[in-house]
Regions:
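Acidic, contiguous N-terminal accessory segments
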Residues: 6, 18-112, 287-289, 296-298, ...
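Active-site neighborhood of glycoside hydrolase catalytic domains
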Residues: 219-299, 303-314
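Bacterial Sec-dependent N-terminal signal peptides
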Residues: 1-22, 639
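Aromatic-lined ligand-binding clefts that engage carbohydrates, nucleic acids, or primary amines
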Residues: 490-533, 594
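An acidic-aromatic loop/edge-strand motif
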Residues: 545, 555-638
């Protein structure tokens, strides 16, 4: 009886772990006796430099109220704390402090764990949109909680140089920075050192990026000549040497030199110039690939499909995969699945060239409310899948598809739907203060009817948000203006009811304003329409936006807006379906068909359709809508 009471109490306080079903990332070896629990009274950290544990690996043992965390380095101890925190219900803001654990109920357990890749990073662009120190520290807490170990800090871009400069203080002068882009805001050397030290205490290495010679409009405006000119290189040498004098190599062993999206007369000479300065400063250089030609000692960061095709066996240098990792592109719902299923560097674990990956967040468009940066771009949900694949290794799941949810019955489908349960758990228990705009949706089935060049194509898709361009590509063609796609799914309910669902027909990238904008008053964006019909009475009801648009027909740009005035117009919540109030969807008892009509109005880089049932909570957060049953597409089943 005493044992039963102990179990009941432990479940009431915090659910114990039966294997590794709730941990992100999942440990490679966890043994737990869930029938034995105890109250934590003491945490002991053991850094054993002569033990056999690899860098960042850790072990956890628990017994009689004491938890012992063992590692060969500080990073391993931090990772152990993160795992323990998830076991007992301590969040990202608290897990570095012992007091948060004392008194928590834990299972008797033994864990041994290590990462598959040595680089598991997150890049934030603060050159285009400045971010306060307090917000960066909070980000670092989140990264450490999910065992990321690199913060790639993009410190300069076209709008501004965000680093204190003593030699050339005019670089910090607001008059030379882009208007509206946080003029006059930059990081002092004291602040940079403080962020690096804060990160190091959490097992994170900071890689500052000074983008050269491209992405540097501020430089031309400040000095009247370009970075790649003879005068510009002289200025740059002084700036780089000052930075390395202020930020010593033990704090900053790597410096990213950018180098992409620019054309200059002597690319080899410029890159050798930069690499020589970095090397003489005792650092290792990183550069984007493709970009200007770099030496074999420089680490390449893959950012495009061209780079992905070139990397792999035979690539001449070490490299980091960011190809699939742009939070600001595409749709956050689709991205979250992509990041989980993507195999970093096309290998299961690191080798002498493949180092891992860095998840990137670029906001080319001006950001007015910095608290919206993460929810607008699908963070932290995108981080969760990336954390699993970068720590646990790329499994190369059968049935994984780029930009499309995997089909029912595939290995990828089973893995993703299982991982979604973890994501929901973390959203509800650790990430309530992060405005995570995501619910499990991979199992939503669709019958897809495509009208293409006077032909009708019937296929299927899965997931609450469907990339229509990807559907067309998978069927062997590129959609043209005038084509139409209809998505249909069926939902069964026991009684007449009204559910709420996110509905959307556009997913503008946060790096450009290319989209059809906000819909006409009373209509959905991008010409989309939604209908609900009940099998029992064959009546059809059209569903309209839940409330009037604040800015109907605004922000319609059918071309990319990089470096143009529209990119200075901040995005608002009503332009992203995952940020909006859910629509009311009346359902009748029995089977109800949901149909999304999606016309191709222009050749958009993003073309999505979404229908995602959600439950709006009283605190503003969201969760899954329960009690719904979906049918399979008719191409698979008659019901």
């Amino acid at each position: 009886m005493k044992r039963i009471l102990t179990l009941i109490i432990s479940f009431l306080i915090w659910p114990t772990i039966t294997d590794a079903q709730l941990l992100i990332p999942e440990p490679i070896n966890l043994q737990s006796d869930n029938y034995k629990t105890f109250k934590i009274t003491k945490i002991v950290e053991v850094i054993d430099t002569i033990c056999r544990l690899e860098p960042e690996a850790y072990a956890i043992t628990t017994k009689n109220g004491k938890v012992t965390l063992t590692a060969s380095d500080r990073a391993g101890i931090v990772h152990a704390r993160a795992t323990l925190a998830q076991l007992v219900g301590v969040g990202p803001e608290e897990f570095m402090y012992d007091d948060a654990f004392i008194g928590k109920i834990a299972p008797e357990t033994s864990i041994a764990d290590k990462p598959a890749f040595p680089v598991r990073g997150f890049m934030h662009d603060t050159g285009r949109n400045f971010r306060e120190i307090e917000m960066l520290e909070r980000e670092l807490d989140l990264l450490a909680f999910y065992k990321l170990n690199v913060f790639h800090w993009h410190l300069t871009d076209n709008p501004a140089w965000r680093i204190e400069c003593k030699a050339y203080p005019q670089l910090n002068d607001p008059q030379y920075q882009r208007k509206g882009r946080d003029e006059g805001q930059f990081y002092t050397y004291d602040q940079i050192r403080a962020i690096i030290e804060y990160a190091q205490s959490r097992g994170i290495t900071v890689i500052p990026e000074i983008d050269m010679p491209g992405h540097s409009q501020y430089f031309d405006k400040t000095f009247g000549f370009s970075m790649a000119s003879k005068q510009g290189m002289a200025v740059l040498k002084v700036c780089l040497e000052e930075f390395m004098e202020e930020i010593p190599a033990e704090l900053c062993p790597y410096i990213h030199i950018g180098s992409d999206e620019v054309y200059i007369s002597d690319p080899h000479g410029f890159m050798q110039f930069c690499e020589d300065i970095i090397t003489k400063g005792g650092r290792t250089a990183l550069a984007w690939y493709p970009g200007l030609p770099s030496s074999e000692n420089t680490i390449s960061q893959i950012w495009s499909d061209e780079g992905r095709r070139a990397s792999g066996k035979g690539f001449p240098r070490r490299y980091i995969d960011s190809y699939m990792g742009y939070l600001n592109l595409g749709n956050p719902i689709v991205n979250s699945a992509n990041f989980f299923l993507h195999q970093l560097c096309s290998v299961e674990s690191a080798d002498n060239k493949a180092m891992g990956g860095i998840l990137c967040l670029w906001n080319d468009v001006r950001v007015a409310d910095k608290t919206k940066t993460f929810p607008h771009n699908g963070m932290p949900e995108g981080l969760l899948g990336f954390a699993q694949s970068s720590w646990g290794g790329g499994k190369g799941y059968e049935g994984a598809r780029t930009d499309l949810f995997p089909k029912l019955g595939t290995e990828a489908y089973e893995a993703l739907t299982a991982f979604e349960k973890k994501m929901s758990y973390h959203r509800d228990n650790f990430l309530k203060d992060w405005n995570m705009r995501w619910v499990a949706n991979a199992s939503t089935p669709w019958e897809v009817s495509i009208s293409y060049q006077e032909k009708d194509i019937i296929t299927e898709a899965w997931g609450g948000c469907v990339d229509l361009n990807a559907v067309c590509r998978e069927n062997g063609f590129t959609a043209q203006v005038g084509d139409n796609i209809c998505l249909t799914t069926k939902i069964h309910v026991e009684r007449d009811t009204v559910i709420t669902a996110w509905v959307g027909f556009d997913s503008p990238s946060r790096s450009t304003r290319m989209s059809d904008g906000i819909g006409k008053q009373g209509q959905w964006e991008n010409g989309g329409r939604v209908f609900v019909s009940c099998d029992n009475n064959q009546t059809s009801t059209e569903i309209f936006p839940p409330k009037p648009w604040d800015e109907p027909e605004a922000y319609r740009y059918h071309r990319h807006t990089w470096h143009q005035a529209p990119n200075e117009l901040p995005y608002t919540d009503e332009q992203f379906f995952w940020m909006r109030e859910p629509a009311q969807i009346p359902l009748k008892a029995g089977w109800n068909a949901i149909s999304l009509i999606c016309p191709r109005l222009f050749n958009a880089s993003n073309w999505h359709a979404a229908f995602i049932p959600v439950k709006q909570l009283s605190d503003g957060n969201i969760s899954e809508a329960n009690g719904l049953k979906f049918s399979k597409p008719s191409s698979l089943s008659s019901q």
